[in-house]
Amino acid sequence: MILAGSVPATILQKTQYVGIGIWILLVRGPAKQTCTYTSGEPMPQFMPFRGLRYTPAAGPLDDLLAPPYDVITPAMQRALGSRNPRNAVHLELAEGGDERYERVAAFLRDWRAQGLVEQDPVPMLYVYEQEFVEEGHLHRRRGIIAAVEALPWESGAVKPHEFTMSGPKEDRLKLLQATGVQLSPVFCVARDRAGQLREFTARVIGDQAPTGTATSFEGDHHRFWAVEAGSYEMRQLAPLLAESFYIADGHHRYETAVNYRNWRSQQGNLPPTHPTRFVMAAIVPADDPGLVIRPIHRLVPRAAPANWLERLGDAFDVERAKLPGDATERRAALQALLATSDAVALELAPRQVHALRRKPGASLAGKVPTGHSEAWLAIGPNVLRYGVLEPLWGISDEDLRAGVIEYSHDLDEVFAFLEARPGEATAFLLNPVRIDDVMRLADLGERMPQKSTYFHPKLGTGLVFYPLEP
């Protein structure tokens, strides 16, 4: 990893936001100086940037934050927009036709003129922590927000794990061309040898009290500190981020940044450290205890074929069970079955549960694409798709593109789906894909099907924006 701007760091300010708790480490230093650490991995450039941030005049930051655009429902959009007229949802997901892009650009110009957002006077790094509860357990996840060179996938410096669709990229590119500002960070994961990156962030933050606290719309807690970091600490960071990054969430945003860079380059050569060459990214250690991947279950609005269990016999061992009536017992029973299964098929009429376990070395009946490794075929979404959904339920690629299958990571939503269609639907529960599998397949150049991973919680939009013009 090449670290640009790694010289003397001083605290910019201790900005007090009433009721805010986003953990942001502001590391001050000139952006044009570069130090290099050599490793065997392809290395993108990595540098601080002059972030554009809300000022206290805009209101409490907990009324300004929003999730990324692609997880905001219409109801959530209305609720967020009503909290504050400057909520980031008005930028990320403006309503209307193509005129909405220019309207967002006008918002940003007006907010700057009114002192509601200000750009940091010098390049910064931002350290960001989220605290949340998952399955009854408290988690904390910490990452560094920085500018990472936006290189094509072929470079190997930043690696994808799933495919993208053209529609969202076209939308994001129009927004970027109109505003010249990246609104939300790409979520990246990096290998953290011996926990050095986590140790680094803990050390530079130290025991300082947070500048403030905030609770997001989803109920997650955020904290931030303005912390001074010296050049010694900055030089330490370079070798800790000396390997490829892996996209956890934000593939469309990353590809949009590459497309914008190419579009902007047609207007003239860009200097090596021009902001347009980079994408704002939050980098989280792969072994961070707070790195949570939720499963994404498949909801099929079709009744199970009459002979599906017999037809599964060649490739799967099947364990049948009765679904408990009590909600707590039901959840516990399903989790226990999933722990030793590739998938669990669930019907509410007659409340049957079938745990499916692929037999070692068994071939799947579906039309498995050629050229893939056994590691790719072994992940739950692929076992289900090519071993069950395609050959037995008749779910084709066209059906998937048409949205025949619904998806959810919430068991309550799964049960509601089935209860609304008694005897006419089936749900398939999956285990979460492990981060080791995500990185292993990315290293092999193999991408997972869409809706394979759900990294939780989503990064907040509105902590810091990334202007692309110096």
Model-flagged regions — what are they?
Residues 6-9:
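Cationic, amphipathic, low-complexity segments that mediate targeting or membrane/lipid association
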Residues 39-470:
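Surface-exposed, charge/polar-rich loops and edge strands
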